[in-house]
From Swiss-Prot:
Coiled coil segments of this chain: none
Catalytic residues of the enzyme: C76 (proton donor), C226 (proton acceptor)
Pfam families, per database record: DAP_epimerase
UniProt KW keywords: Amino-acid biosynthesis, Cytoplasm, Isomerase, Lysine biosynthesis
Annotated TM spans: none
Family: Belongs to the diaminopimelate epimerase family.
Protein name as catalogued: Diaminopimelate epimerase
Amino acid sequence: MRSFSFTKMHGLGNSYIYVDLFRETLPEEELPAIARSVADVHTGIGSDGLILICPSEKAPVKMRIFNSDGSEGKNCGNGLRCVAKYAYEHGIVSDRTFLIETLSGLVEARVAVADGEVTSVTVDMGEPRLERSAIPMLGPEAERVVAEPFAIAGGEYEITAVSMGNPHVIFYVDDIQKAPVTTLGPLVEKDPRFPEGVNVEFVEVVNERELHFRVWERGSGVTQACGTGACAAVVASVLNGKTARGEETVVHLAGGDLTIVWGHDGRVRMTGPAETVCTGVYYYRGGRNG
């Protein structure tokens, strides 16, 4: 049996198993299997996936994320806040503002600290990409997808698509409690019009400063929160005239609230909590199948 030390953390209920690769070593070829194993609620630890906290040549720390199905993701807003908290509290960084490398590029994080503990994290999520080719979604590459008709499973909808370094598609609903997250979500995620798959968000507009939000995440299914998805929802709401550019919007997720602003400088900034759940040692047999 092999083993490694882990920390379980969550951002608004979006939980991952975090492994510090400044101190641990995991075989690259086994990472998808390890992610599937630790995510299993019955035979593993139970989480939405695996996040590696890695050395970087471009920043003080690098984040790699593996979904619960073993696929590697490019970005995760809730994960970034947890990585920032871990890096500061474990001495990987000493400054309260620092860069984190992701597969989507470099991200700036700023931690708020009280009595040595990180209480909240603000992450500069960068500029959204809106052209169809950046999502990616089939169709005219340079066009934006804003309130575009979308037919699926016998229904007619309107969608807005946003890339926050990973793909998102937003559906507006009148009642978030009745949103077809588990029925429409998986169908849209794997729809061939999205060649790399897509995260599917359902949004109810409360007012121009508040949104209710539910998500079906690509590779993970229903989760309590999705930071990049909440950012995409705010961008989509500005594009559709439902919220205001440059103003803070509170997004109510199943796991709690995020405060997000799409600034006039083009950048999206997200503020929210990050929590440590537990630490431990995980035992596994090794091999590509776990």
